Curated annotation (Swiss-Prot):
Species: Enterobacter cloacae
Organism ancestry: Bacteria, Pseudomonadati, Pseudomonadota, Gammaproteobacteria, Enterobacterales
Active site: E463, E539
Signal sequence region: none
Keyword annotations: Glycosidase, Hydrolase, Magnesium, Metal-binding, Sodium
Record protein name field: Beta-galactosidase 2
Gene: lacZ
Residues the entry annotates as binding Mg(2+) 2: N599
Length: 1029
């Protein structure tokens, strides 16, 4: 250890600890469970704020330097004259200094471990503060930095105190010897890059600074240094033993004792006391400073994500005279996690992981997470039927785990290790020089977090290949904590360093035989020889932009194959940052918007929620697929359904099933039943229906489960599950349409014109298109009605293609190469016939690119005596071109309807491979709500399986998908950010007979399942269109 008295700033800079993988800290205290040092038991029991902890969050003084060598030597003892205020916690890039960098795989610095660039942005923080005189008289005062990116040196009152790296775990230092009465000064030199940055190559914004809490903690001379709590349940789960281990420190602990008291809901359950000294450990004896208790508990209330039953354990350290020296406390959850018979189990029952990956991200605050945002994340997750979260890819803020304990979420706690940009990826994992750094990131995480019942799995990190260092750390984990399984995806997801087969983006039925690390279909994987472990996808369903297609297919597999135990969606929140344009207007920015290089553009936008936590439509698909109730239509006569509960541990004590029978959205009958279902139980319900009268339209039975009472995570009336089925309808014979005045055809060399009362249609002979429709003398079209075979590319269509790199296999590149974004229409035939009751216009167009025919579109337009336009359209597709994104029509309407009314799937956006959550019904929304404001503009807003659409005066009937909004497909295709879109007059209507799925198994390879790709080379569709007075 260096001599602290001789360490000048220049000496520290010369030593360059931040480029030495063998140096991860100087003087940093050992990791331990979070400590509060209450001095009375009651506040510890109540989890009240401890007077022994003092937050140093607030406004510090700050200077930014492009490199540490530019820091003046005097800064250690006094602020620079040009120091500015800096909020702590914060990332300095969010405060106007330096540049945030978004990159996924590529390191943001040249890869030359352990060395980092000489230009190493450095933030110099300082704070003056006073200390309570009583703290100076006795005991120990520490400072705790919960998170500093990426490394820092610390001074107090001009004295160098130490060094630390690892951005996501606490760094704690003893300041007792240097604190003084009156004013004290902290100085913290934070480096943007260090050798540890090579272990922190996560897919996220790369930012710097003191971004988590800073706290002073005062401990008595004799103190509780650490504690560990383990619950041991018998096979019947009706008896438990609470095992608690405490380590003491300081002078005189041999004469002390610790009183352990277990509480539940304020009532004392048990209390025992112990003096220091462990049982004999080996031939050299026992631990003098440690003590262990085992407290038997009969019929414990068990913890699970469904029933987060918590006890409170207080540990009071008593002095020789029985005086309370300090108290530590923690929440305790009695649960057992194990893997048996190839299944991950909690309390003896196989789990189904409804999980999501979550990075700590806030659009204004960067990587600073406040309690309100954490709570909001958990509440939204649970409202949408998530029961698990993976801390991707680093240990989270300490409060996160306490909230997961209390709300009820299963947690994968993941070490801050990712070397994705290394070639090979396992380069550092197989290098013994990097074992100490990797080891600290695993062992310190466990020492901090092991008492949380919500943590059911440890993870060795992410995307770092597989090497000997991983094997060593796996063995350490299994020895240190045999109560939890370990997972690690690197090296193929099924190495000896994982208890769970945990692939990312493996598909349901399709093998991906990559060299060295094949990804088999998940169904195949669990049946491979000698593979007996459960399979839980550590990442799947890449929710980038308008994506998430095929999610229901995964859940069909999970529910059908017991050893397919779910997975973690990638990911929770769009990682966009708030930025202001040249006019001062805020918008959400992604990679490259700050001039950052390298960058991966919008690949940071993979969330189920927008940065402000507004849901993406995909979130509803997740909610529906993961719902805890499944429904079966047993019979229609009598009408009987079966409801099965997917809850493993709780009965339905707050659930009501409501049902309606509706014809074309109009409710014919309804009812409500209180559910009384045991865990994993079934309830059969017979629904008494009145006689249904014959009438036009489809009849649907809709059921939904709501929770009438509010819960800690949801409001009263929260809808948690739903289903619907079509019912047989009484035979209905539609009356013949009334006759009216027939339309009249007039024509010349340029146009065909049809007139009916106050309406007039005009077809252009040169193009063959319907170019105008007058109603009451007013033009209602701003563009012709044209064929539409392309869409503004989705992220999944683009894949990895960008300006400097082209993936010829990406859908968008195939469409571009075929000319589908640059088609011209050539009229081959256009004629009209006057009939007694109608006018028929027949057109034939070829859609071609540079003289090559891609599509042939034949349209038969019938205008009847009711003034209704009937379309009968057949499209033939060339055999040697890529499958199209859509087949349909597009038109720019002059009217801007205030609302949209439709009979079909809704109410939210849905696509052919992402429509499980949508329901058949009649829906009405404002026009603005028909648009989904994806940050990177794409095709959006589709509603599938529509039978009737009303847009102001326009009414369309048939069987089609549609989208309507203020932006053309061309504008969506050419615009890079949502805030740059400009509303166009009127409204754009896209009417689709076919629309390709959006895909979503991943976003870098074609992932639309074949059943959602047009397999035929000819498609015919019909519809009717009228304008109401």
């Amino acid at each position: 250890m260096p001599n602290t008295l001789s360490l000048t700033l220049s000496a520290i800079l010369a030593r360059r600890d931040w480029e030495n993988p063998g140096v991860t800290q100087w003087n940093r205290l050992e990791a331990h469970a979070p400590l509060h040092s209450w001095r009375l038991e009651q506040p510890a029991l109540d989890d009240a704020a401890s007077a022994s902890r003092r937050s140093l969050n607030g406004v510090w003084r700050f200077n930014y330097f492009p490199a540490p060598e530019q820091i003046p030597e005097a800064w250690v003892t006094e602020d620079c004259a040009d120091a500015v205020p800096m909020p702590v916690p914060s990332n300095w890039q969010m405060q106007g200094f330096d540049t945030p960098i978004y990159t996924n795989v590529t390191y943001p610095i040249p890869v030359n471990p352990p060395f980092v660039p000489q230009e190493n942005p450095t933030g110099c923080y300082s704070l003056t503060f006073d200390v309570d005189d009583a703290w100076l008289q006795s005991g120990q005062t520490r400072i705790i930095f919960d998170g500093v990116n990426s490394a820092f040196h610390l001074w107090c009152n001009g004295r160098w105190m130490g060094y630390s790296q690892d951005s996501r775990l606490p760094a704690e230092f003893n300041l007792s010897t240097v604190l003084r009465p009156g004013e004290n000064r902290l100085a913290v030199m934070v480096l943007r890059w260090c050798d540890g940055s090579y272990l922190e190559d996560q897919d996220m914004w790369r930012m710097s600074g003191i971004f988590r809490d800073v706290t002073l903690l005062h401990k008595p001379e004799t103190q509780i240094a650490d504690y560990r709590v383990v619950t041991d349940l018998n096979a019947e789960l009706d008896r438990a033993v609470l095992k608690a281990d405490v380590a003491l420190a300081g002078a005189g602990f041999a004469d002390c004792e610790v009183v352990f008291t277990l509480w539940r809901k304020g009532e004392k359950c048990a209390s025992v006391s112990r003096r220091p000294g462990s049982a004999v450990v080996d031939e050299r004896g026992s631990w003098d400073e440690r003590l262990t208790v085992a407290i038997p508990i009969d019929r414990p209330a068990l913890w699970s994500a469904e029933t987060p039953e918590l006890y409170r354990l207080t540990m009071a350290l008593l002095g020789p005279q029985g005086e309370v020296l300090e108290v530590e406390a923690c929440d305790v959850g009695f649960r057992r996690v194990d893997i048996s018979n190839g299944l991950l189990k909690l309390n003896g029952k196989p789990l189904l992981i409804r999980g999501v990956n979550r990075l700590e991200h806030h659009p204004e605050n960067g990587q600073v997470m406040d309690e309100a945002t954490m709570r909001r994340d958990i509440e939204i997750m649970k409202q949408h039927n998530f029961n698990a979260v993976r801390c991707s890819h680093y240990p989270n803020h300490p409060l996160w785990y306490r909230l997961c304990d209390r709300y009820g979420l299963y947690v994968v706690d993941e070490a801050n290790i990712e070397t994705h940009g290394m070639v090979p990826m396992s380069r550092l994992a197989d290098d013994p020089r990097w074992l100490p750094a990797m080891s600290e990131r695993v062992t310190r995480m466990v020492q901090r977090d092991r008492n949380h019942p919500s943590i059911i799995i440890w993870s060795l990190g992410n995307e770092s290949g597989h090497g000997a260092n991983h094997d060593a750390l796996y063995r350490w984990l299994k020895t240190t904590d045999p109560t939890r399984p370990v997972q690690y995806e690197g090296g193929g997801a099924n190495t000896a360093a994982t208890d769970i087969v945990c692939p990312m983006y493996a598909r349901v039925d399709w093998d991906q035989p990559f060299p060295a690390v094949p990804k088999w279909s998940i169904k195949k994987w669990i049946g491979m020889p000698d593979e007996t472990r459960p399979l839980i996808l550590c990442e799947y369903a890449h929710a980038m932009g308008n994506s998430f297609g095929g999610f229901a297919k995964y859940w069909q597999a999970f529910r059908s194959h017991p050893r397919l135990q779910g997975g973690f969606v990638w990911d929770w929140v769009d990682q966009a940052l708030t930025k202001k344009d040249e006019k001062g207007n805020a918008f959400w920015a992604y990679g490259g918007d700050f001039g950052d290089t390298p960058n991966d553009r919008q690949f940071c936008l993979n969330g189920l929620v927008f940065p402000d936590r507004t849901p993406h439509p995909a979130l509803y698909e997740a909610q529906r697929a993961q719902q805890f109730f499944t429904f079966t239509l047993v019979s229609t006569s009598p009408l009987m359904i079966e409801v099965q509960s997917g809850y493993l541990f709780r009965p339905t004590d707050n659930e009501v099933l409501s049902w309606t029978v509706a014809r074309d959205g109009k409710v014919l009958a309804s009812g409500e039943v209180t559910l009384a279902i045991a865990p994993e139980g079934v309830q059969r319900l017979e629904i008494a229906l009145p006689e249904l009268k014959a009438g036009p339209g489809e009849i649907w039975l809709n059921v939904e489960v709501r929770q009438p009472r509010a819960t800690p995570w949801s409001p009263a009336g929260h809808r948690c599950a739903w289903e619907q089925w079509p019912l047989p309808a009484p035979l209905f014979i539609a009356p013949p349409a009334s006759t009216g005045e027939p339309p009249v055809l007039t024509q010349n060399d340029r146009i065909l014109e049809v007139t009916h009362r106050q309406q007039r249609w005009q077809f252009d002979r040169a193009s063959g298109y319907l170019t105008q429709w007058w109603r009451n003398g007013v033009e209602t079209l701003l563009s012709p009605v044209t064929d539409n075979v392309s869409r503004a590319p989705l992220d999944n269509d683009i894949g990895v293609s960008e300006a400097t790199r082209i993936d010829p296999n990406a859908w968008v590149e195939r469409w571009k190469a075929a000319g589908m974004y640059d088609l011209t229409s050539r009229m081959l035939h256009c004629e009209a016939e006057q009939h007694a009751r109608e006018v028929v216009v027949t057109t034939l167009n070829v859609l071609e690119h540079r003289g090559r025919a891609l599509f042939l579109s034949r349209k038969i337009w019938r205008l009847d005596e009711q003034g209704v336009l009937h379309g009968d359209i057949q499209v033939d597709i060339a055999s040697d071109i890529p499958k199209p994104a859509r087949i349909g029509l597009s038109v720019h309407l002059a009217e801007t309807p205030e609302k949209v009314d439709w009979l079909g799937l809704g109410p939210h956006e849905n696509y052919p491979d992402r429509k499980l959550a949508a329901q058949q019904g009649r829906w009405t929304l404002p026009l603005a709500d028909m648009h989904t404001p994806y940050i990177f503009p794409t095709e959006n807003g589709l509603r599938c399986d529509t039978r009737k659409l009303v847009l102001g005066a326009h009414q369309l009937n048939g069987a089609f998908h549609f989208s309507v909004g203020r932006y053309s497909q061309q504008q969506l295709r050419e615009t890079t950010h949502h805030h740059l879109l400009r509303e166009e007059p009127g409204g754009w209507l896209n009417l689709d007979a076919f629309h390709m799925g959006v895909g979503g198994d991943d976003s870098w390879s074609p992932s639309v399942s074949p059943e959602f790709i047009l397999q035929t080379r000819q498609l015919r569709y019909t519809f009717s269109w009228q304008q109401n007075p």
